[in-house]
A protein has these predicted regions:
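Alpha-helical substrate-recognition element adjacent to the catalytic core
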Residues: 2-110
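C-terminal cap/substrate-recognition subdomain and adjoining C-terminal extension
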Residues: 85-203
Length: 203
């Protein structure tokens, strides 16, 4: 049976792996735990070895339950440069089950000022409503979301501050959006015109 829930696409670096720790040289935000990952295949996939002592990432164990609380209203899927390895290394550390993975283009080449993942998302999410956590959206992506919504496919881009990662207020926005879509679907009213995009970063 076709899943009628909207998709919820989840990036790793920034939304889950806070940039405040690994990329700025500073401390991770409160609630985050540092992990060291070891995987010999990283050299083959990305052309360089893991950092000595393992790759350090910062994850918040609260993110797993926070995302799972949305699973009754959204179908969760990875949309990340980690690709399938998100299921191997990220999900288990925060309590997520194995999730579908959006096939993404090779490399990180932007197209017409859009986020590099957009071609993969357009193909994967064809015909479905989409909410998306990422920290690399551009103004062109916001325009894409607005047009997609106006064309009848509700689209919510949640801009995540990579220093703090996904906050409860971000998850609440997705939950409210998905509940609105469900109510609209039951009533039979068109979804176009409801508030469906979050373009501002959380305070």
């Amino acid at each position: 049976m076709t899943d009628t829930r909207p998709l919820l696409l989840i990036d790793v670096d920034g939304p889950l792996n806070a940039h405040g720790g690994p990329y700025s040289g500073g401390d991770a935000p409160d609630g985050y735990v540092m992990h060291r990952l070891h995987n010999g295949s990283f050299t083959d996939e990305h052309g360089r070895p893991w950092a000595q002592g393992g790759l350090r990432i910062w994850l918040n164990p609260a993110h797993g339950p926070m995302l799972l609380a949305l699973a009754d209203r959204c179908e969760l899927a990875w949309c990340t440069a980690w690709r399938e390895t998100a299921n191997e290394f990220i999900g288990p550390l925060i309590g997520l089950p194995e999730l579908p993975v959006v096939p993404l283009p090779d490399g990180w080449v932007t197209l017409n000022d859009h986020i590099w993942k957009l071609p993969g998302v357009e193909e994967y999410a064809a015909g479905r409503a989409v909410a998306w956590f990422d920290d690399e959206f551009t103004p062109a992506d916001d325009e894409w979301a607005e047009k997609r919504t106006a064309d009848g496919l509700a689209t919510l881009l949640v801009h995540i501050d990579p220093v703090h990662g996904i906050r409860q207020c971000d998850a609440d926005r997705v939950g409210e959006w998905a509940s609105t879509l469900a109510a609209v679907s039951i009533s039979g009213e068109p979804a176009v015109g409801t508030p469906l995009r979050v373009g501002d970063r959380a305070p």
